[in-house]
Amino acid sequence: MDDITAISQLKYRYLRTLDTKQWDEFAECFVPETTGDYNGLLFESRDALVSYMKENLPEGFLTMHQVHHPEIAVDGDTATARWYLQDKVIVPAFQFMLEGAAFYSDRYVRTPDGWRVAHTGYQRTFEVTYDLKDLPGTKVNGPGEHTHV
């Protein structure tokens, strides 16, 4: 597999494991000294970043993160990438929904186990929040639930 494909698959695994809350596999996306900057929310290690996500995106928080239009540059055993993010967070218990977009800026390092994230983060281009009570007819179904029409 070429480096750009491997880095793309790593980013997709990061997003899938974040949204499915598979925290051990999520942690495997990073080197221990990973740093993060999510629009000013800073992290100085993999453990701090993963712990924060685990505590702040518990079961019942529905998330969708998608990235598009990668700009990946590989230089030996390091790489950089920019990704266009679209995301949504729904918290039925609080009747809350957030939609937004951002640009991720990532750095990667090649390890004996393959490419890993050395730094990740994004800068928001916009964010919209909704009170679900203000959206008539809204029904939110989580994993395993379906609306039958």
Model regions: which residues?
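A beta-strand edge to alpha-helix "cap/lid" segment located at domain peripheries
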Residues: 58-149
